[in-house]
Amino acid sequence: EMVIRDWSSDVCSSDLTLEQVYADTFHTEACLVRPQITCGTHALAIALFGNLRPGDELLSPVGKPYDTLEEVIGIRPSNGSLAEYGVKYRQVDLLEDGTFDYENIRKAVNEKTKLVTIQRSKGYQTRPSFSVKQIGELISFVKKIKPDVICMVDNCYGEFVDTIEPSDVGADIMVGSLIKNPGGGLAPIGGYIAGRKDCVENASYRMTCPGLGMEVGATLGVNRSLYQGFFLAPMITKGALKGAVFAANIYEKLGFPVVPNSTEPRQDIIQAVTLGTPEGLV
């Protein structure tokens, strides 16, 4: 069967090469890297909607996700959420010490659990961010309960902080934003979805539309910045880590609670400082 499409809308070789560079770097079967993905929340929404269907259940074994994902999932009512499409959501909060509640995670996984979403970074919370090793242990635990469950890792703020990524420890999908670590400060827009080929393809049908997927999408001249940013990303991430350690040292000495502290190992580039009052911020 011959499929004829407007040549001007087809993906150029520069796109495909960039995606292969990402896939090779992250050791995955496939990767979707596009400027049409506007931010990390958008990338996560594409991955979730692309791989979940009505009647499926989504499980977060790491507590509440980012505020922006609450409306995507339907934790807070919003138009077009996963909840509106019949996807149910379960959540298992972390234990008081910030570790995984394996007992209740085991109870939460059931025959309808289609996808488990794991947020690597603390985000706006004060819990510790998770190491790749911890994420691998959680994925292994979940897969023993339900081998066919899709394990997705929100890798925002975590790329290149460690020598390995969640895709190296069993993640089926790994999602991130190019306006954070992998963009190296040069990417003006974009996101990536890396992982199993079928999962990435499913996400691509949500990014564009069924039947087209990753075969279309103009780059509007930003690919050069995406390539250069990805090349510089490890160095830029290193600089961000140095800045975070420096900030932790300063605020610690001023008496403010900080997470992580100035000597703890770092799993992302986020530095939390508890100022205590609105006036403290000013």
Regions found by a protein language model. Give the residues of each.
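Conserved PLP-enzyme active-site core in the AAT-like
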Residues: D10, A30-C31, T38-G243, A248-Y251, ...
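Intrinsically disordered, low-complexity boundary segments flanking structured domains
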Residues: E1, L18-Q20, I75-S81
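N-terminal glycine-rich, Lys/His-bearing helix-loop that initiates the first secondary-structure elements
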Residues: R5, S14, K242
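Single conserved hydrophobic/aromatic residue that forms the stacking wall/gate
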Residues: E1-W7, V11
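Long amphipathic N-terminal alpha/beta scaffold segment
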Residues: S14-C31, A43
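Conserved C-terminal alpha-helix-loop-beta "cap" of PLP-dependent enzymes
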Residues: E252-V282
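Ordered hydrophobic segments in well-structured contexts
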Residues: V3, A30-V33, I270-A272
